[in-house]
């Protein structure tokens, strides 16, 4: 069983059933309009090393969940075959693989070489919250990334941006998840804060090297360590620029 640590107090106000119904109707309408505004594909990005796709089973499971959520046809056996063919054509080296599923159920994959991951990176804290961090386009990985693109660092030395929600809780980066060393443990933001549950994050939660918790942006200076994590690059030590006390 996963343990969850909380580093923030939450206060909620009662909501009437009629107000709740109106809220849910508004959310459903907004989600419909967001989906209809532009076509998108479901996406998985994974590491291929010497012909072996990293965590392929977990990536395909996540794609299947996204396909079910968006009502996209998904043929798992075809996805396995598509990945296997691509892997066989890249028997050597390290590659960034993008596996995409469109609305009609068509799958395609392509690979690009990736340079070695840096030993450490710089991250910056977003200046404003990510609105609607609970959006389906945050919780599921797709080619719709406008909500992330506007947080791209302008400084070329900065690798990515640390996002936070409207409650002031840290969520993720635009290209991966986060871990913070607090009170002697590595904590990753809990999924309910509004983030994409990454495959590498899930692996480390399962093996016990990470636990979930709520981390306030205002408390970042207390972290004894920071790491950026994703399935493509693994675990990378990070420093956060612009804080009074470096992490």
Feature annotation, model-predicted:
Residues 19-96, 100-247:
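Helix-start/capping segments and mature chain N-termini
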Residues 1-14, 233-240:
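Conserved, well-ordered active-site substructure
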């Amino acid at each position: 069983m996963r343990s969850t640590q909380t580093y923030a107090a939450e206060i909620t106000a009662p909501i009437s059933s009629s107000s709740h119904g109106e809220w849910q109707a508004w959310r459903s309408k907004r989600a419909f309009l967001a989906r209809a505004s532009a076509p998108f594909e479901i996406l998985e990005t994974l590491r291929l090393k010497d012909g072996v796709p990293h965590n392929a089973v977990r990536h395909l499971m996540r794609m299947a969940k996204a396909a079910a959520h968006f009502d996209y046809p998904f043929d798992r056996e075809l996805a396995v075959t598509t990945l296997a063919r691509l892997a066989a054509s890249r028997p050597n080296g390290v590659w960034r693989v993008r596996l995409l599923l469109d609305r009609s159920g068509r799958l395609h994959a392509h690979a690009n070489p990736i340079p070695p991951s840096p030993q450490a990176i710089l991250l910056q804290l977003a200046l404003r919250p990510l609105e609607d961090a609970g959006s389906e386009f945050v919780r599921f990985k797709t080619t719709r990334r406008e909500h992330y693109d506007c947080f791209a660092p302008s400084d070329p030395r900065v690798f990515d941006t640390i996002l936070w929600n409207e409650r002031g809780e840290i969520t993720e980066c635009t290209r991966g998840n986060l871990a913070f060393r607090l009170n002697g443990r590595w904590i990753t933001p809990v999924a309910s804060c509004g983030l994409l549950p990454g495959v590498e994050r899930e692996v480390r939660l399962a093996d016990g090297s990470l636990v979930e918790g709520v981390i306030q942006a205002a408390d970042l200076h207390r972290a004894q360590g920071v790491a950026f994590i994703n399935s493509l690059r693994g675990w990378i030590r990070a420093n956060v620029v612009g804080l009074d006390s470096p992490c």
